[in-house]
Amino acid sequence: MTDDYELLDSGDGRKLERFGRYVLARPCSQAMWRPAKSAAEWAKADASFDREDGNNWHGRANLPKEWQIETAGVRFKLGGTDFGHLGIFPEQRAQWRWIRQRVGEVVSGQRPRSEDAAGTVLPRVLNLFA
């Protein structure tokens, strides 16, 4: 299973993450410790988001408007928002794995399933996060 997400470092109220081929530095208020990587490593990020600087992306031109990654066996379409989010929260990966497993069980016939008028299998999942 491919995992295009990686937490590279965190500290000083920020996190350094890899989403596919792009490395991003974003705020993380819980990261109150010192980062393990050097400032030079953090400076290599393709883009960074800063709340102290008026909620601005720096280097946003280095990112495509949208791109896809796969993590926890699920493919996601990402894009930077004006408030520093990308459209997913990687800390939810355990839930995505669970959802993927349940959908697989429905599709394979291991769990009860419903079908639409055309006979297409319709797994039913309600993810109330966010």
Predicted regions and their residues:
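Mid-sequence acidic-hydrophobic segments that form the walls
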Residues: W98, R102-V106, L128
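Intrinsic disorder/low-complexity segments
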Residues: E105-V121
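Non-catalytic substrate-recognition/targeting regions of SAM-dependent transferases
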Residues: T2-E17, L24-P90, R97-R100
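Serine/threonine-rich low-complexity intrinsically disordered regions
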Residues: S38, Q95, R113-A117
